[in-house]
């Protein structure tokens, strides 16, 4: 990160945050301003409860408290923070986060109990990792793509473990991937084992903040380790879940720097995107090849299934839309309805 002096606007934000803090400090005293130094720029590389690890402009990492006036703080947030003074007594952290800059994007996931939760900020692209083993699932890829389109974050499809394919298998998989290439998605074929195809992936990651998404078994961690180098292997930092819902462990999202440039946020929150909180219209919009046919159906309330005069189904029959994608569209809608039914049943059971 380059070291930047705070602009007047940023300084005003710090001061305004301070004034709000003064008005809301009756419940519990906040930290004394005299314990901290001058404001500086930083990026959150991880969040742990009411603490955050902030990387300063010179690359050092500081464990910071978070002002109570900050309502949302996640990995990837760019912040204004202040270092703790060496003489500060009773403060076991190195600084405090004062303010959060406006986000360019935010990655969220639905939660049955807390609604839609942010899990990472300022993401440039989502790398959808799939593999031929344990199974190449286009349905899972399509689910991730719908989530990317809804979040308005650029996706890249990465197919791992291509070293396990023979010539015939490679031809078949390429035909499957052509479905996505033909509608404008970038597809990269790689092997974390042999490192085939890693160079184009490195180039796609350079200068951008990425997050890797993929189900268990696709080699996401192995791929990240190969890209980060052995000295920066992804480690799981288990923290206990005290939700009262049983014994669970989770891992905190963390930002890493690639040696070739660019950053990656590794988060367990994107192993699988839930789509049940979306409306059917949002799922339809998430299939980019449908866009040219929306509004052309005979009936305004067309479900794009067996409805007479459905322009999307006609495009499928004419070979303009891949039948596999059309089938997965309806599978997603069906799975959403099932999850919502279970959620509604659970709500009425409380």
Curated annotation (Swiss-Prot):
Subcellular location: Cytoplasm
Cofactor(s), names only, from the UniProt record: Zn(2+)
Family: Belongs to the TRAFAC class YlqF/YawG GTPase family. RsgA subfamily.
GO cellular component: a single term: cytoplasm
Protein name: Small ribosomal subunit biogenesis GTPase RsgA
Description of how the protein assembles with itself and partners: Monomer. Associates with 30S ribosomal subunit, binds 16S rRNA.
Pfam families (alphabetical): RsgA_GTPase (PF03193)
Alphabetically ordered keywords of this record: Cytoplasm, GTP-binding, Hydrolase, Metal-binding, Nucleotide-binding, Ribosome biogenesis, RNA-binding, rRNA-binding, Zinc
Enzyme class: hydrolase
EC number annotated for this UniProt entry: 3.6.1.-
N-terminal signal peptide: none
Main localisation: cytoplasm
GO MF entries: GTP binding; GTPase activity; metal ion binding; rRNA binding
Free-text remark on how the cofactor is bound: Binds 1 zinc ion per subunit.
InterPro entries per record: G_CP_dom, NA-bd_OB-fold, P-loop_NTPase, Ribosome_biogen_GTPase_RsgA, RsgA_GTPase_dom
Domain CP-type G: 104-273
Protein role: One of several proteins that assist in the late maturation steps of the functional core of the 30S ribosomal subunit. Helps release RbfA from mature subunits. May play a role in the assembly of ribosomal proteins into the subunit. Circularly permuted GTPase that catalyzes slow GTP hydrolysis, GTPase activity is stimulated by the 30S ribosomal subunit.
Biased composition (Polar residues): 1-17
Binding site for GTP: 160-163, 214-222
Positions that bind Zn(2+): 297, 302, 304, 310
GO biological process: ribosomal small subunit biogenesis
